[in-house]
């Protein structure tokens, strides 16, 4: 049975109809409505396509009402939490319903714009109907109506996403030669950069869907599944009190408002992504297929803990309690029995990932401690072993290079791959050589 939502004004315009925003931003809006008196709805815009997709039509047919299911491990125990969400007003198709989308920009109640249009969505392409051009058109309509500016919270996974969106929008406005509009955007609109952190699986598997239908008394085709963990970092300009308008903390959301989000980005990349990248090749060669299997294995569980708490921990410039809580949450997230994170999927493009996610930690550790982090350094040996197999999924150039069977030192000297000559790091080549000389038999074969 579809529940009728309480009439509330539209306060959020959302570009992107996918599962992530519905399980992240829209879930937060529901929490603010329930716990913090936000009193607002989200109007979703499907930014691409000639017509609404079947999932968008299904959500509209339900009056915007759907459920979230948060599944994972909390305090060492598996949990499965079903929640109602009444925060979505409706979904519009940008191409087929642009007049209605533009009318939304003229709503006096509107204050926030959120988006997730993929990493390629925030781009300036002259003459093309990109997402930033759509934003520029909406701001033009709002400016002409004499209404206040808007606050932008892009969730695309690019660095400084708010700054990037603002640059693209102003470039389109400059193309139009509208100096008054440009001045209003610069003065009255706020573009906040963000960092989002929650793993969202999307639709449940058929068996789970049947179980949820029995619990709910209906089959919700718009139900979305994610992990319980969530973290939202919003970089705000000096003097702007976003928390006064967006009471996320009051609603119990794990949010940080900060003038500099870089330490939190570093934390996520090094702890969450780096621990993956440093361990996955060895896990694959040991015969494992999913991350949760690795965490359940005593050897790899200890390995993860050494990497997280002994090697990554000192290189992240944040308070000790914040780092420890996040590192512990990473282990719980890795152990999520509902996630089914495939090791081979995570291993995609491992060379470039190792450069970004692991190497900076090694360099910082050496700078701080004067010695190499043993496990992270030895992860390079496992990377080399993995790239000698037929399981590798990387660019044709990288795959071809490793098929030529280069020596470890040759690989380490490839500055185009690593950004520096790894043999110049004191002791690095010797540590890798020692790791490569040791027994390579996969653990599962010995068990």
Task: Describe each model-derived feature in a short phrase.
Residues 1-447:
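Substrate/ligand-engaging "lid" and interaction regions
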């Amino acid at each position: 049975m579809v529940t009728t939502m309480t009439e509330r004004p539209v306060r959020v315009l959302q570009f992107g109809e996918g599962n992530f925003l519905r399980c992240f931003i829209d879930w937060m809006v529901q929490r603010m409505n329930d716990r913090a008196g936000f009193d607002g709805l989200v109007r979703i815009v499907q930014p691409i396509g000639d017509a609404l997709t079947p999932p968008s039509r299904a959500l509209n047919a339900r009056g915007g009402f759907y459920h979230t299911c948060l599944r994972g491990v909390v305090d060492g125990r598996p949990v499965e939490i079903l929640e109602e969400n009444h925060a979505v007003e409706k979904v519009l198709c940008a191409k087929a319903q642009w007049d209605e989308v533009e009318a939304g920009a003229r709503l006096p109640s509107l204050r926030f714009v959120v988006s997730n249009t993929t990493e390629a969505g925030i781009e300036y392409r002259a003459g093309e109907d990109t997402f930033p051009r759509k934003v520029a058109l909406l701001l033009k309509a709002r400016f002409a109506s004499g209404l206040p500016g808007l606050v932008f919270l892009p969730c695309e996974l690019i660095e400084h996403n708010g700054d990037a969106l603002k640059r693209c929008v102003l470039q389109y406005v400059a193309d139009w030669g509208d100096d008054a509009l440009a001045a209003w955007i610069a003065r009255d609109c706020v573009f906040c950069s963000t960092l989002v952190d929650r793993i969202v699986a999307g639709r449940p598997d058929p068996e789970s869907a049947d179980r949820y239908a029995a619990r709910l008394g209906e089959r919700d085709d718009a139900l979305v599944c994610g992990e319980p963990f969530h973290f939202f970092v919003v970089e705000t300009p000096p003097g702007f009190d976003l928390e006064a308008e967006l009471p996320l903390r009051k609603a119990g959301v794990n949010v940080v408002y900060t003038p500099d989000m870089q330490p939190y980005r570093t934390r996520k990349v090094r702890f969450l992504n780096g621990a993956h990248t440093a361990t996955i090749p060895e896990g694959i060669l040991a015969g494992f297929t999913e991350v949760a299997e690795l965490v359940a294995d005593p050897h790899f569980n200890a390995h993860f803990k050494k990497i997280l708490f002994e090697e990554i921990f000192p290189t992240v410039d944040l308070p000790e309690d914040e780092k420890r809580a996040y590192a512990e949450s990473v282990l719980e997230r890795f152990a999520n029995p509902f996630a089914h994170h495939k090791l081979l999927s995570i291993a995609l493009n491992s060379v470039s990932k190792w450069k970004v996610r692991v190497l900076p930690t090694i360099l910082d550790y050496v700078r701080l401690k004067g010695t190499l982090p043993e496990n992270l350094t030895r992860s390079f040996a496992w990377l080399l072993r993995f790239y000698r197999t037929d399981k590798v999924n990387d660019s044709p150039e990288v795959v071809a290079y490793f098929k030529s069977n280069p020596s470890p030192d040759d690989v380490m000297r490839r500055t185009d791959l690593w950004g520096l000559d790894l043999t110049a790091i004191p002791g690095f080549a010797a540590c890798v050589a020692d790791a490569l000389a040791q027994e390579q038999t996969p653990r599962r074969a010995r068990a």
